[in-house]
Amino acid sequence: MINVESPLNLETTLGSLQFSHGSVQNIGMSISMIIGCELGDKSFIVTALLAYQYGRASVFFGSYLALFFMTSFAVLVGRAAPFLFPKSITHILGGTLFLIFGVKMLKESKEVRESQQSLENEFDKVEKIIVNEEDMKKTLELGLPASNRSSSTLKDKFFKVFSMSCFKNLFSKKFSRAFIKAFALIFVSELGDRSQIATIVMSAKEKVLDVFIGVNIGHMLCTMVAVIVGRYISNKIEMYKVLFFGGIVFMIFGILYIFQGF
């Protein structure tokens, strides 16, 4: 007996396939956006250095948990945007932001290429900052005067907040120290970062769940690369190429969003 689907069932099936295709596309765009933002970014470098110093597992979970919280916040903000602005305005504003970020990254790529900076140079700079913070912390704990001591920075405040005993009771001393430090540094460095703003923009335009899944997958991939081979690839990848790739990705997204706004 031949079973002929009714037009209604056929329409429903096609709608489901279209939804699935759209979701895969949104997730793929979110992943590529995060890779373009985070690969070689300061958060990537901090994660790689901390993993080299303390151990991979604790740093991975600390870094990724911070990124997960920041992503959740960005997605919620983006979800609220369509209720505040018309859809066309949201698309145009979001596309404009993507274009601005894209142009800025391409400009940075050109400057880095002309100055012959490498990703390894960025690792060295961030490593010095981390070492200086450790030295300052030890000096303050010993009660010694610090000539270059300034008012408490935002990172110091966050580090004190997340260094509470409840965290220390959950993990061993070494794991707790690495976990808390990775969480605090990544959390602060991601505030107002390109990836956070881009997540807000994409959440305002695309399906929130798709963006949430894609962004978290992207962050997970970048964090895994950072903790496993981050320091090793620092002298294998040219910084200007990373920035150029990110700039192109942002430019493409910006043009697509502005086009859809009209």
Curated annotation (Swiss-Prot):
Membrane-related topology note: Multi-pass membrane protein
UniProt main location, coarse: endoplasmic reticulum
Family: Belongs to the GDT1 family.
One GO molecular-function entry: manganese:proton antiporter activity
Keywords on record: Endoplasmic reticulum, Membrane, Transmembrane, Transmembrane helix
GO cellular component: endoplasmic reticulum membrane; Golgi apparatus
TM ranges: 31-51, 57-77, 83-103, 208-228, 242-262
One biological process term in Gene Ontology: manganese ion transmembrane transport
Protein name: GDT1-like protein C186.05c
UniProt key word Acetylation: no
Location in or out of the cell: Endoplasmic reticulum membrane
